[in-house]
C-alpha cells in the first residue's frame, strides 16, 4: 500500500521524540522563522525558495546524498562558515506567538503568515493535486 502511494516505511536505529520526518521538518521551520524574524527575507521569499529549489531537490535525493554529491570537503567548508549563523534558540517563535495572540491560527482562521482567502486555498489545492497525480503516475 505504501509503495503505491510513493511512500516508504523505514526502520529506525532507536526511538526519538518527534520521528525523523518531523525533526527534519521542524529544523527547516526553525530556520525559516529565523530568516523572517531576522529580516533577511519575507515569508513569501522563504516559501518561494523552498518550492523552487530545496523542495524539488529533496524530492529526488536526501540531504546526506546531496552532501555526498556536493563533496564533503565543500560541505565542511560551508558548514564551518554557516553553522554559527543558523538559528539555535527559540526567539523566532515570537512570530508564531504574536499571530496566536491575535487569533491568527493559519488556514483555519483565514490568516497566519498569509491571508487564506478562497483564491489561495484553490491555488494550493490545485498545486497539491497536480503534484500528487505526478507522484502517483506508474
What label would you give each PLM region?
Residues 22-24, 119-120:
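Short secondary-structure transition/capping segments
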Residues 1-2, 32, 82:
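Hydrophobic alpha-helical packing residues
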Residues 6-14, 38, 43-138:
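NAD(P)-dependent Rossmann-like dehydrogenase/reductase catalytic/cofactor-binding core
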Residues 1-23:
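Rossmann-fold dinucleotide-binding core
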Residues 25-31:
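Structural/interface elements that position substrates and couple domains in central-metabolism enzymes
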Residues 33-37:
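Regular secondary-structure segments
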Amino acid at each position: 500500500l505504501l509503495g503505491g502511494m510513493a511512500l516508504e516505511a523505514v526502520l529506525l536505529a532507536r526511538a526519538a521524540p518527534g520521528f525523523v520526518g518531523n525533526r527534519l521538518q521542524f529544523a527547516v521551520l526553525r530556520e525559516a522563522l529565523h530568516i523572517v524574524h531576522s529580516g533577511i527575507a519575507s515569508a513569501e521569499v522563504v516559501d518561494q525558495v523552498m518550492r523552487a529549489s530545496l523542495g524539488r531537490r529533496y524530492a529526488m535525493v536526501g540531504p546526506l546524498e546531496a552532501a555526498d554529491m556536493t563533496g564533503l570537503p565543500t560541505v565542511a567548508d560551508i558548514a564551518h562558515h554557516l553553522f554559527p549563523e543558523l538559528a539555535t534558540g527559540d526567539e523566532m517563535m515570537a512570530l508564531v506567538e504574536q499571530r496566536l495572540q491575535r487569533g491568527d491560527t493559519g488556514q483555519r482562521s483565514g490568516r497566519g503568515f498569509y491571508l487564506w482567502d478562497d483564491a489561495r486555498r484553490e491555488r494550493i489545492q490545485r498545486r497539491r493535486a497536480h503534484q500528487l497525480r505526478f507522484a502517483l503516475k506508474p
